[in-house]
Every structure is written in structure tokens, then in C-alpha cells.
Amino acid sequence: MNAPMNVLLPDALVMAAIIVAWLNDTFTGAAGRRLTYLIAVVASVVAGVWFAVQALDPHQYYFFSRMVVVDSFASMMKAVVSFGFAVTFVYSRKYLEDRDMFRGDVFLLGMFSLLGQLVMVSGNNFLTLYLGLELMSLSLYAVIALRRDAAQSSEAAMKYYVLGALASGFVLYGISMLYGATGSLELGEVYKAVSGNTDAAVLMFGVIFIVAGIAFKLGAVPFHMWVPDVYQGAPTAMTLFVGGGPKVAAFAWGLRFLVMGLLPLAQNWQTALVILAALSLIVGNITGIVQRNIKRMLAYSAISNMGFVLLGLLAGIVKGDAAAPANAYSSAMFYAIVYLITTLGSFGVVMLLARRDFEAETIDDFKGLNKRSPVFAFVMMVMMFSLAGIPPTVGFYAKLAVLEATVNAGLTWLAVLAVITSLFGAFYYLRIVKLMYFDAPQDASPITGDFCKRTILVVNGLAVVALGLVPSPLLTACLQAIRHTLQTLPL
């Protein structure tokens, strides 16, 4: 279909905001930091609304020699990551101010990371997908390392950089092998090539390296080594930069690679995803039980939740053939969005408890939170219930949708494993609730925070409950977006 260039205007808005914020930060210095912050937040919100409106358009548009695609799936994912970054900026403001880190480069790097995610979501070419990945990754490496006076931050940044560079090398090597075997970098052409008589051995090696790169970006076992150390070592605000929107973008990136380009090889990569998902569910849920550091606990929570996302990705295939793929992939998409919402709320409360000379890092810091602030204790309880998959929170329906897709794919044993390991994981989520409501507070100081942050945090908590009571609108939106994207494939 003819592609009107105005479809790219929200992406251009983000790029323009980066340029304006960069110029403002360069020429005004410390005096203009608040304006840089406002530019980042407003641009993210406006772009998010624009993307959400675009998601209603069922057509697919291609740009730049089919290197970029804009469809319902891309627009919806872009809206989610844009809103996610806006909320991340708001939650982080006071935390950064208290630590003298409220600087323009933090928000500029965040915006560059957002731009990379927008490219990842809309990539229709191996090179475009890789460039988006690198733009996001390099920005995140830098933002974690900004606090140079903290040894833990520097160590976390170094680990993330070294392992991230290794994963990027895997992806690039896999792309080179797939290009050599198919003669094309465009996803549609690769799809056609691998459907024919292409060198199976070369394709297999290429797929293995691609899957390894996807697993690293999602933080799936055994490529999860960086996740607990980076979550714990980085400042909490930077942890949210890494653990929020990038996870959603990584899911969309993986779906573009595996489904839009390599679906004919699904019988091969499904086996790899089964192993990754099973290991992630086991390691994430069981290891999280022994964690006393709240950020490290949430890191293992992220690992186990990415196991559920992988379940949705692999459940679209039955015995090597596409079977009800829209339901399976939409369940993974729904789960990724729900995970972002609950992660934002969880880290929002963690940062709310932090002060200038105090980091809320251990689970004991949540003791008696209900006595200090019943509202935010309730918000944290809702987030923990959602992560544990307890009704009526939206996390329950997210897990249920993925498990249903997994059973329909004939992988009942994997669904049973997911349920059993989730019961282990529920222990450390409910332990936080127990500490907040049944233990005496260690610190009686009042909970402080600006009005905007407190308001959005309450809305965040209410959204988790509201989506749990009425999940069908979001589920339907995910299903329609996936259907519109898959309509070009000969399923």
C-alpha cells in the first residue's frame, strides 16, 4: 500500500525532541535541566498518544525500501514503550534530584534508548533490527555508568556492556549466516527463502545465534547472568530504564525475527524456546526465594516472567505448523504489556521509599509500610499480587492466557511446570505483602514524593486492578494487532 510519510511523524517527533533537548542542555547547562526533563516527558506522552491512534489503522506501510514497517503491532508496541518511558521519567525525577543525577544526559540517553526501541519494533530488515538494538543497548550501557563515583554502578555497567557486546556479536553473526544462506536481509524475502530448499545446516546455526541474542535481551536462562547484578548494582532509576520498556521492545524484536522472518523454521527454534522458557521459569522462581535485596528479587522475577513471554512465542506452533498463532502471540504481547505496567509500579514504590541518604534495597525496608502509607502499601500489594498471578489483578489473566495457548499447542507438561514454579514464585511476592501489613516498621519517617509521582503511582495501581476486572479491551487490541501483522504471511 502507498505509504504516506505522515505515518512516521510520531517517530520524527521523538527525534526532534532529542535534538531540541540536546541543544537546550548544551547551551543552558544546569539552568535548563528541568526543561530537558519536560521535553522528554511531553514528547514521550504525545508520541505515545499518536502511536495509539495509529494502532487503529489495520493497514501495513513500508518505508525506505521496505526496511521499516508500520502496522498495528508496531504502533501499539511503540505506544506502550513511549508511555512506559514517560512514566519512568516521572518516577525517577525526585530520586535523581536527591542524588545529584538530575542531568540532561540522563534524559537524552533515555530518549535515545526510546528511539532505538521504536526502530526495533518497526524493523522489517535484519540491519534495521540490529541498528535499533544497538541504539537502545549503547544508550542503556551509558546511562547505567553515569554514576561514576559508585563502584557498584561501574561494575554493573561493565558487566552489562561486556555481555551485551557478546550478545550483539551473536546476533550479527547469526544475521550474516542467514544472509549467506538466503541472499536477503528483508524479513519477507528471508521467509520465502527459508521455505524453499536452502542450506539447512547454515540456517540452523544462524537461528541458534539469533535465539541466543533474543534470550540475552529478554534475560532468559542461561543468558541471564547480567540481570541480577545490573538490577542490584545500578541506581534504582537506571534499573527501571533497563527493566521496563526494553523488555517489551525485546519481545517485539524477537517476534519480528522469529515469526515474520523465520517462521518456516519454527520446529527448530520452538525447541530452543522450550528449553529457555523451562529453565527461566525454574531458575527465576526458585532462586528468587532466597533473595533479601528487593531489586535482586525483582530481577529474578523478571527472569521468570520472561519465561512466560517465551511460552507465548513458542505456543503458536504445533508439530512444526502454525496453529492458532494469533491467539498465542497475542497472549505473549498481552503478557509483555502487563509485565511493563507492574514493573513500573513496583519500582515506583521502591523509589518512593528512597531518600537522599537512604536506598530502599532490602525487603526489610518494606516492613510496616501499611502504617506509614496505607495507599502505597496497597499499590505495592497490587503489584505483588499481579506478578504472582493472583486474581482479580491483570497478572492472573496474563498468565491464564499464556497457559491456555501453551496447552492448545500440545505442551501441557510445560504449562504444568509453569504453574508449579509460579507457586514457588508466589512465596517471595507474598512475603513482601506480609512484611508490609504484619510487621512493625523499622523507620517511622513519612513517605515523601512530589504530587505528580504519587498521583501516577496510584493510577498505576488502579490500572492493574481495572485491567484485571475488565481485561477484554486490551486482550482484544493485542489480538487485532497480531492478526493485522500476520495477514501478510501464508499461514
Where are these regions (language model features)?
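Alpha-helical transmembrane segments of multi-pass membrane proteins predominantly involved
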Residues: M1-L491
